[in-house]
């Protein structure tokens, strides 16, 4: 199994990014990142997604962090999906306001031995504390994507 590098913060671009390799087919990875029953096994505590089309909305829930509304912004099966999500501010009038939320974009590519998975999360510049948010999400992507790898490689 390939050892995957940790996430990187780019404070100049206000992004967090990570690239990993998963020993699974692109179809299996696509299902794991787009079907709510699979998503809930590796990404937070629970996931609710209406459908996987641009404009669809849902909620991702995380222990200790609460519920985060999401809206699909881009979808090109089985290669790319991007979703906007709120920053968890319980007082936000519109939690998916483009000026107060971030977008995470997953891109999949077939490689020898499986699938390359890239995530880039952008939009931190509009949040109340961009540096703290980027660092928090960096750690989150490290943990969650490690869970995705374990899940797709036969973990629980």
Region locations from a protein language model:
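Short acidic N-proximal helix/loop "leader" segments that mark the beginning
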Residues: 1-17
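Amphipathic alpha-helical segments
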Residues: 23-42
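A short, structured loop/turn motif at beta-sheet edges
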Residues: 26-27, 73-80, 107-116
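Hydrophobic/aromatic beta-strand elements that line small-molecule binding cavities or substrate pockets
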Residues: 18-20, 68-74, 101-109
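Beta-strand/loop substructures that line and gate deep hydrophobic ligand-binding cavities in soluble
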Residues: 92-142
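Hydrophobic pocket/interface hotspot
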Residues: 29, 39, 58, 72, ...
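Short, highly charged C-terminal tails/helix-capping segments
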Residues: 51, 150-156
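Short beta-edge strand/loop motif at the mouth of beta-sheet-based domains
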Residues: 11, 17-18, 37-71, 80
